[in-house]
Amino acid sequence: MITAIVQFALPSPISLEEAARRFQSSAPNYKNLPGLIRKFYLRSEDGRRVGGVSLWESRQAAEAVYTGEWRARVQQHYGSTPEIAWFDTPVVVDNGAGKITKAA
């Protein structure tokens, strides 16, 4: 498994309500994506940065989504270019499901 942390600075701060509205509008694009295990949307407390943390089955699955077209869509929607940081994710603790998952 791999975790992608995507962040981008906004041209101007947005409220939590506006961030939630924008996130809700893009969320259906990520539903049932091959290889995506979980996605969390993020907004900094000052509203100047937004992004997401996504847990993927593999980097290959993530890179199939984070294409030039995806970057252009983010740029158009938020007015900023996304930055992606990659992290190997060998173990996940899921208290909601009551399980610990180890990467294959």
Model regions: which residues?
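Glycine-rich, phosphate-binding/catalytic loops in enzymes
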Residues: W70-A72
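Short S/T/G/P-rich N-terminal loop/turn motif that feeds into the first structured element of a domain
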Residues: M1-V50, R59-G68, H77-A104
